Amino acid sequence: MAVSLWQQCIGRLQDELSAQQFSMWIRPLQAEMDGDTLVLYAPNRFVLDWVRDKYINIINQFFTEQMGSDAPKLRFDIGSRPSAPKPIQATAAVVKPKLESSPQKSQTSFNVNAPEPAATANHRSNINPTYQFENFVEGKSNQLGKAAALQVAENPGGAYNPLFLYGGTGLGKTHLLHAVGNGIIKNKPNAKVVYMHSERFVQDMVKALQNNAIEEFKRYYRSVDALFIDDIQFFANKDRSQEEFFHTFNALLEGNHQIILTSDRYPKEIDGVEDRLKSRFGWGLTVAIEPPELETRVAILMRKAQESGINLPDEVAFFIAKRLRSNVRELEGALNRVIANANFTGRPITIDFVREALRDLLALQEKLVTIDNIQKTVAEYYKIKMADMLSKRRSRSVARPRQVAMALSKELTNHSLPEIGDAFGGRDHTTVLHACRKIAQLREESHDTKEDYANLIRTLSS
């Protein structure tokens, strides 16, 4: 009875949560009765803690509404319920559609550019062993992506298939792909895990056509245990490659073999890619990887400095992190330059030294991102007048973009809250603070706001 009640609760949660939240946190749960207690099994500690912190009140409220004082107690545990290996499924709305093709699987390897038989799993896979979950710096900007990647590594071909990670350049998507691959190979050393850039897939297909080896190409790619393709947007306008990948995708999913894809944009926004592919990209879980927030940027710098054997003062790390915001690659490149200059000159790493070592980079960053530039960009994005940013109008169509612009100004510039308020028509600093908190809340609750904010950061940081 209580397990049936949980199925009803799943329906309620599916209605109330975003598709990403539901797929990420609710779909992996398994339920089983233990006396008068309903036990919910989570795949790992991260999911367990998140569900218990965020959704336990909603779940208990639903149980009470349905059964009153007879509502079951609720307990959380990690693992799979003993009586069945599969989770209780959600309603048909989230079930993957029937695949259009199911080519026969084969263990034959593709011959073009094939590795030597004695090659190791890492060499055969192109998986970089240096990219691990342990050295991936986690923050709010990439927390969901890392959690999803961890679950895929533990259970490839399971709930999140395909996993689609998207976001700007240098944010850690490739690191997560390799970390998943290393996790799978660690658990199953003989697993055939293949990582590649999308252009390599295209090149392999072209070579196969030239060498009359297209059947070997098909058998090779459709026989892997896990296929990770980076920058899938480069399939745009390559019709034959899209056709081959379409059938490869179908074959792998039918065999419950894991697929992970990355892109610089949301699947539906990828121009030049067929709708049937874009639709399939969203069958599993789609997660945004956003530019790292200040605390994460500092942590990245401190980790990188530690790996390089350098003692980086906290104030220097904060100085760099506050001024370079676009991506991890830029941060690491700046730190490498600072370290190289320090080693060459023998000078200690201070804020003044960093100002000198990065003067051209810092000058460019300050020139590109100004409050005025943010206001103009946001006004254009939301199709409102620039004057509305400074006006007293409170209609939602104007107030929300203004709040977004204030939040971006706090994140992307070094201006204080009073200075930002002055730039928005002489508003008080408390108004700016309220706007920042409101937008932070909406980014957690609203997929549209999260997307808008990420798009604007990419535009302003490019």
Swiss-Prot record:
Residues 343-462 are annotated as: Domain IV, binds dsDNA. Residues 84-125 are annotated as: Domain II. Residues 126-342 are annotated as: Domain III, AAA+ region. PROSITE patterns: DNAA. InterPro entries: AAA+_ATPase (IPR003593), Chromosome_initiator_DnaA (IPR001957), Chromosome_initiator_DnaA-like (IPR020591), Chromosome_initiator_DnaA_CS (IPR018312), DnaA_C (IPR013159), DnaA_dom (IPR013317), DnaA_N_dom (IPR024633), DnaA_N_sf (IPR038454). Residues 1-84 are annotated as: Domain I, interacts with DnaA modulators. GO terms for cellular component: cytoplasm; plasma membrane. It is found in: Cytoplasm. Keywords: ATP-binding, Cytoplasm, DNA replication, DNA-binding, Lipid-binding, Nucleotide-binding. ATP binds at G170, G172, K173, T174. The keyword tRNA-binding does not apply. Plays an essential role in the initiation and regulation of chromosomal replication. ATP-DnaA binds to the origin of replication (oriC) to initiate formation of the DNA replication initiation complex once per cell cycle. Binds the DnaA box (a 9 base pair repeat at the origin) and separates the double-stranded (ds)DNA. Forms a right-handed helical filament on oriC DNA; dsDNA binds to the exterior of the filament while single-stranded (ss)DNA is stabiized in the filament's interior. Domain I is involved in oligomerization and binding regulators, domain II is flexibile and of varying length in different bacteria, domain III forms the AAA+ region, while domain IV binds dsDNA. Belongs to the DnaA family. This is Chromosomal replication initiator protein DnaA. It comes from Shewanella woodyi (strain ATCC 51908 / MS32).
